Swiss-Prot record:
The active site is at C418. CDD domains: DUS_like_FMN (cd02801). Residues 1-111, 202-238, 261-285 are annotated as: Disordered. GO terms for cellular component: cytoplasm; nuclear periphery. GO terms for molecular function: flavin adenine dinucleotide binding; mRNA dihydrouridine synthase activity; tRNA dihydrouridine synthase activity; tRNA-dihydrouridine47 synthase activity; zinc ion binding. Disulfide bonds: none annotated. Signal peptide: none annotated. This is tRNA-dihydrouridine(47) synthase [NAD(P)(+)].
Length: 714
C-alpha cells in the first residue's frame, strides 16, 4: 500500500469497524508485554536510538513524500488554553500567512436549513403545543415539511439507531434528531389519518437511571440552573464571604504598607530579645483580624494508584474525560474557566463545570489511603474545577459561587501555569508566578470562602528558563509569607500543589525537568515533616490552619507517556502522584497501562472503538441533532489532531516511547492503522464520518496549524 501516516488517501470502509475487525478484516492485535530494547528481527541487532526521533522499525519506514508535512508541535499550547488564545485579536495590518497557527479560529455552524418550532419538537404531529408567536414565527410548523425539506436525511451509522435513545430510552433532540426514524412511528388515528409520533423505551429508561444521587436525568452533575445564571448576570446573587474577606485583604494591605514604610520590618524579622518578640506581638495586635476562619475541608488523598488527567482546555471536555475515567483515570479536572465570566453568569463558562456522574464517584484507592488522618473515601470524588484570574476579589467570588452552585467538586484548582500571552499580559496564569504575595492572598482567600472544598494550585518552574522560582513559591505557600507572619493568619491553606516541569518561556519545547520536580518533592517532604526545623521559626504555621492535618500533597506533571515514565516519577522523583496531559490525548489508554504495569499494543480497531465511544458520548452530551453532531465532530477532530501522533508500540525498535520524539514517515500494519496515524485533515474528516456521517455544508474546521485547515464546499 502507498502513502504515509502523515499524508494518506484511502477508501473508508463501510462496514461497522469497531465490532472486532479492522479494515483488512483481521481480528484485533493482542495486547502484549514489550520490554526495552525491541530487537531487529532481520539484522539481529537494533540500530542505535537517535535522540528526538521515534525509533520505528525499518520495515515500517517509507520514503519522504514530495509534499512537505506541517509540524504538529505547534498545537501543544492548545492543550493549555486554546479557547482563550483564540480570543486575542492578532489582526495588525500584516499580510495573512498560509503557515503558522490559526489564532482566530471559526468553525462555521451546523444547523437545519429552517429550524423546527420549539412547540413542535417533542409533540405528536396532530397535537402540537401552542406557539406563542403564531403566524409571525420564523420556524417551521409543519412537521412533514420540516422532515422532508429542511432537515438532512437520517444517518445510517450506529446501525441507524440513535445512540442517545439507545442509552437512555429517550432522545432529547426529538424530531430534530438525525436518527429520528429509530424512535418514531407512523400510527393510524381513529379517523383514519396517519400521524407521526415519537416513542420512548421504558425499559431502557429504567436501566439508565443515574447512579449518583444528585445527578440529572442525563447522568451529569454540577448543572447550574438558568435562574442562577441570570441572577449572576444581573448581580442579584450576593457573595458575602468573598466581599468581606476581600475588604479585609484591602485593609490589611494598607496597614502593612504603613508598617513596611515605617522601617520596622528589619527589626521584627529577626527578634533577638524577649523585648523584641514582645514588641512584635504588640504590632500583630494592631492589625485587623480576619472576619472569619476557613471552614474545615474534606481530607484529600493522592497516591500512586490515583493518576490524574490534567485540565485540558478544549480537549478536556466531558466526553473525553468520561472516556479517560472508563480507561482508569482516577482524578479529572474541568477545562480552565475564567473567574470574571463565571461571576457574570456566562453560560459557556458554567458549561465547563458539568461532569459525568462517573466523575462524581470516589476514586479507587489502596489501603494506604486509610493512614491519612480523617480521609473518607466514600465522600471523595474524582472531578475538580480549575479557574484562572488576575484579581483576588474575582477568584474569591468565583470560588464562593462554585462552592454553593456546584458542590460536587473534589477541589477548586487555581491555574498559575498557563503560558498563553493573552492571560499572561492580563496578570493571570503563569504571570502569578512572579507575584508571590498576590498569589498567596488569592489562595488564602479562596480557602476562606470555599466551605468544605479544598483549594489546590498548578504552577510551572517559573516564567523564564534561567530563573526558576517554584521552590521559593512552594515554601511560601506551605509556610506563609512574611506578611502572613505579621498578620498571624497562618499559611495559605493550599491542599495540593502540581508542578509542571517547564517554564513559561519554554512552553512545550525540550523535555520537562523532572530533576527539578524531584528536588521540589524533597523540599515539600521536609516542610511537611519537619516544619519546626525551618530557619525562620517565627513563620512556623499553626497545625489547625494547615490542610490535611499538616500534609500538602505534591503532583508532578510533564511528558508522562507510558507506565514506565509514571513508575519512574513515583519511585525516583518521589511525587505523590502524576498528572497526565498530552500523553492522555495521544493515547487515552495510558491509564490502563499504568494500572496493568505494562505496554498495551492497541490495534487499529480497538483505537477506532474509542473514537466510536467519543462520538456516542459527544451526542449524549451535546445532542444528536444537526447542531449537536456538529459540536461533537468539532471536538472529535480536536482530539484526533493529537491522537494522530501515536506511533503503535509494535512498530518501535526501542522502548519506552518518548512524547517529544518526532517520527519519520511510516506506514501501519494495515490500512486503518495508517489512516489513524495520518496528520492530514482530510483523513480526520473521514474518520469522523464513519460515525457522524458527512459533514454539514456550512461546517468549517480550523486546526491550530493553518496547513491542516478544512472547509466544506457547498
Amino acid at each position: 500500500m502507498e502513502g504515509t501516516a502523515q499524508n494518506l488517501d484511502v477508501e473508508v470502509p463501510k462496514q461497522d469497524l469497531p465490532n472486532g475487525t479492522d479494515s483488512t478484516g483481521e481480528p484485533p492485535l493482542k495486547k502484549v508485554r514489550l520490554e526495552e530494547p525491541a530487537s531487529d528481527q532481520q539484522n539481529g541487532q537494533a540500530p542505535p536510538r537517535l535522540k528526538g526521533v521515534a525509533p520505528i522499525k525499518a520495515e515500517f519506514l517509507i520514503p519522504k513524500p514530495k509534499q512537505g508535512q506541517a509540524a504538529v508541535s505547534s498545537t501543544d499550547d492548545a492543550a493549555e488554553a486554546a479557547a482563550y488564545k483564540d480570543r486575542e485579536d492578532e489582526k495588525k495590518g500584516k499580510k495573512k500567512k498560509t503557515t503558522g497557527q490559526n489564532k482566530n479560529r471559526t468553525f462555521g455552524r451546523s444547523q437545519d436549513s429552517k429550524g423546527l418550532c420549539a412547540s413542535r419538537v417533542y409533540s405528536p404531529e396532530f397535537s402540537p403545543a401552542e406557539c406563542p408567536f403564531g403566524d409571525k414565527c420564523r420556524f417551521e410548523h409543519d412537521l412533514r415539511t420540516y422532515l422532508k425539506e429542511h432537515k438532512r436525511e437520517d444517518l445510517n451509522t450506529f446501525n441507524g439507531v440513535c445512540p442517545v435513545w439507545s442509552a437512555r430510552g429517550k432522545c432529547d433532540a426529538g424530531w430534530k434528531c438525525r436518527f429520528v426514524g429509530s424512535h418514531s412511528i407512523e400510527r393510524v388515528t381513529e379517523d383514519g389519518r396517519k400521524e407521526l409520533v415519537l416513542v420512548e423505551d421504558e425499559e431502557r429508561r429504567k436501566k439508565a437511571q443515574p447512579v449518583f444521587p444528585s445527578a440529572a436525568e442525563d447522568g451529569t452533575v454540577n448543572t447550574t440552573s438558568p435562574a442562577d445564571k441570570i441572577a449572576l448576570a444581573k448581580r442579584q446573587r450576593p457573595t458575602p464571604r468573598a466581599d468581606a474577606y476581600s475588604d479585609w485583604l484591602d485593609l490589611t494591605s494598607k496597614e502593612l504598607e504603613k508598617y513596611f514604610h515605617g522601617g520596622q520590618q528589619n527589626k521584627d524579622a529577626h527578634p533577638d530579645t524577649a523585648q523584641d518578640k514582645e514588641e512584635k506581638e504588640e504590632n500583630r495586635a494592631t492589625y485587623t483580624e480576619a472576619p472569619f476562619m476557613p471552614s474545615e475541608k474534606r481530607r484529600l488523598y493522592f497516591g500512586p494508584e490515583t493518576p490524574a488527567l490534567a485540565p485540558l482546555t478544549t480537549q478536556g471536555n466531558l466526553p473525553f474525560r468520561r472516556l479517560c475515567v472508563e480507561l482508569g483515570a482516577q482524578l479529572t479536572y474541568s477545562e480552565m474557566a475564567l473567574s470574571m465570566p463565571l461571576i457574570q453568569g456566562h453560560k459557556p463558562e458554567w458549561a465547563l463545570m458539568r461532569a459525568h456522574e462517573t466523575e462524581a464517584l470516589p476514586p479507587t484507592v489502596s489501603a494506604r489511603a486509610s493512614v491519612v488522618q480523617d480521609y473518607d473515601n466514600s465522600k471523595d470524588m474524582k472531578f475538580g474545577a480549575q479557574i484562572a484570574g488576575n484579581k483576588y476579589r474575582w477568584v474569591m467570588k468565583a470560588t464562593e459561587v462554585l462552592s454553593s452552585l456546584t458542590p460536587n467538586l473534589r477541589v477548586i484548582d487555581l491555574n498559575c501555569g498557563c503560558p498563553i500571552d493573552l492571560l499572561y499580559r492580563e496578570g493571570s496564569g503563569s504571570a502569578l508566578l512572579d507575584a508571590p504575595s498576590k498569589l498567596e492572598k488569592m489562595l488564602r482567600g479562596m480557602n476562606a470562602v470555599s466551605e468544605q472544598i479544598p483549594i489546590t494550585v498548578k504552577i510551572r518552574t517559573g516564567t523564564r528558563d534561567n530563573t526558576p522560582n517554584a521552590q521559593k513559591l512552594v515554601e511560601r505557600l506551605i509556610l506563609g509569607g512574611h506578611e502572613a507572619s505579621m498578620l498571624n493568619c497562618g499559611p495559605s491553606g493550599v491542599a495540593a500543589i502540581t508542578l509542571h516541569g517547564r517554564s513559561r518561556q519554554q512552553r512545550y519545547t525540550r523535555e520537562a525537568n523532572w530533576e527539578y520536580i524531584s528536588e521540589t518533592a524533597a523540599l515539600i517532604k521536609r516542610l511537611n515533616e519537619k516544619s519546626d526545623e525551618v530557619t525562620d521559626t517565627i513563620r512556623e504555621p499553626e497545625e489547625r490552619m494547615r490542610p490535611n492535618g499538616g500534609k500538602t500533597w505534591f503532583l508532578g506533571n510533564g511528558d508522562c507517556y507510558s507506565h514506565v515514565d509514571y513508575e519512574d516519577h513515583i519511585k525516583n522523583a518521589k511525587v505523590d502522584s502524576v498528572m497526565v496531559g498530552r500523553g492522555a490525548l495521544i493515547k487515552p489508554w495510558l491509564f490502563e497501562e499504568i494500572q496493568a504495569g505494562q505496554y498495551l499494543d492497541k490495534s487499529a480497531s480497538e483505537r477506532l472503538a474509542y473514537v466510536e465511544k467519543f462520538a456516542r458520548y459527544g451526542m449524549e452530551t451535546w445532542g444528536s441533532d444537526e447542531y449537536g453532531i456538529g459540536i461533537t465532530r468539532r471536538f472529535l477532530l480536536e482530539w484526533l489532531s493529537f491522537a494522530c501522533r501515536y506511533v503503535p508500540i509494535g512498530l518501535l525498535e526501542y522502548l519506552p516511547p518518548k512524547i517529544n520524539d518526532r517520527p519519520p514517515y511510516w506506514r501501519g500494519r494495515n490500512d486503518m492503522e495508517t489512516l489513524m496515524g495520518s496528520h492530514d485533515y482530510r483523513d480526520w474528516i473521514k474518520i469522523s464520518e464513519m460515525f457522524l456521517g458527512p459533514a454539514h455544508k456550512d461546517f468549517k474546521f480550523e486546526p491550530k496549524h493553518k496547513s491542516n485547515s478544512y472547509d466544506t464546499e457547498g
